[in-house]
From Swiss-Prot:
EC number: 6.3.5.9
Pfam families registered for this protein in UniProt: CbiA, GATase_3
GO biological process: cobalamin biosynthetic process
Its biological purpose: Catalyzes the ATP-dependent amidation of the two carboxylate groups at positions a and c of hydrogenobyrinate, using either L-glutamine or ammonia as the nitrogen source.
Site positions for Increases nucleophilicity of active site Cys: 427
Named cofactor requirement(s): Mg(2+)
Residues at the active site: 327 (nucleophile)
Additional comment: The a and c carboxylates of hydrogenobyrinate are activated for nucleophilic attack via formation of a phosphorylated intermediate by ATP. CobB catalyzes first the amidation of the c-carboxylate, and then that of the a-carboxylate.
Similarity remark: Belongs to the CobB/CbiA family.
Protein known as: Hydrogenobyrinate a,c-diamide synthase
Domain named GATase cobBQ-type: residues: 244-435
Lineage top rank: taxon: Bacteria
Reaction catalyzed: hydrogenobyrinate + 2 L-glutamine + 2 ATP + 2 H2O = hydrogenobyrinate a,c-diamide + 2 L-glutamate + 2 ADP + 2 phosphate + 2 H(+)
Amino acid sequence: MKGFMIAAPASGSGKTTVTLGLLRALKRRGEVLAPVKAGPDYIDPAYHRAASGVDCFNLDPWAMRPGLISALSSRMTESGARVLVAEGMMGLFDGAIDGKGSSADLARLLDLPVVLVVDCARQSHSIAALVWGFSQFRKDVLIEGVILNRVGSPRHEAMLRGALAPLGVPVLGALPRDPALSLPERHLGLVQADEHAGLESFLEQAADVMEAHIDMDALQTIWLRPKRYDAMANVARLKPLGNRIAVARDDAFAFAYMHLFEGWRRRGAEISFFSPLADEAPKADADAIYLPGGYPELHAQRLAGASRFRTAIGDAAARGVTVYGECGGYMVLGKTLEDAAGVHHPMLGLLPLETSFARRKLHLGYRLLEPLGGLPWDMPLKAHEFHYASIVREEKADRLFRVRDASGENLGEAGLRVGSVSGSFMHVIDFSGEAA
């Protein structure tokens, strides 16, 4: 599929706002879009969906096999999409410790031209050195346009354009400084899209700014250029947790990867959704229940009082139904959760651990997992860990994974499993290797 990537020299350059504005502007022009977020981030994809009206897939070149990324790209083409719009993560060449898994790697894999968003707030002629360095750093990654962001005045814009003119990299537009074009944040990143009361107005405003200040015809020329190679379409996927999987989905359980659901459906699984915050129970015929990550620490009191949800999960576990929790879902499977104010809330009590958001410590990074039983995955896995909550008490139980970091350093064992119930702080993304 033809498309392009919005990337930047560093985080905080404005690429998310630019991506959202372009998605909405292209949607208004009638383009059929395939939004993509590079890396493991859960929050930006919900904004992409709001802007485009289409589900956004995470494509992670560190955690996913190249074949899976190519297959997911092909799947988007099969669904009728015509333009893939990818938002990079961090800086264009930033990845794991060795630099692998960067946005540049994804652009190379999918043959996407890169549009570089540069924060110009505190520079003028120095931008030429920055853009030149980025354009020359990897010859297999093509930077085919620049968007100047946070430009202070027409004079500032003229200086920037003059500095870049000798490089031959097209300047697609210059966006003025505008504090209104920023999104609210919290501890794991942006506030979730569903909680942004003025999101629709923000997206329309961002699209108006893109239409007014970016040469959309020049951008189209970039994404319509001939591709150098085609992606492969078929690849093995992670086995589903069951045949009929009930997935918790609401503001407390919002962090789930679309590619997992798509892959499970392709392998014949049925997926249904329920809201613990609305005190809903999973479907009675579900043979697997998935509690993904999210923000249970912000909704602990409501979860503690959700009697129908609590009873249904407990009954399902007693019947031997697979119950699997990741990160926030893992915390909810434990005995208690201490919120930021130090209040302890009873959780499901299906795993012998107590967690705290009051005693915060950042845990962040890619992980290599060796399953130790309890799940349908018996091959090495790649995952991501990102949370502030800590385990304050943990009783003896079987472990779920043996863990290494991205550089291969042994981090010991993690997660718990009791009967058919299991969980950990790891967000599983893909398996490692080519055999399912």
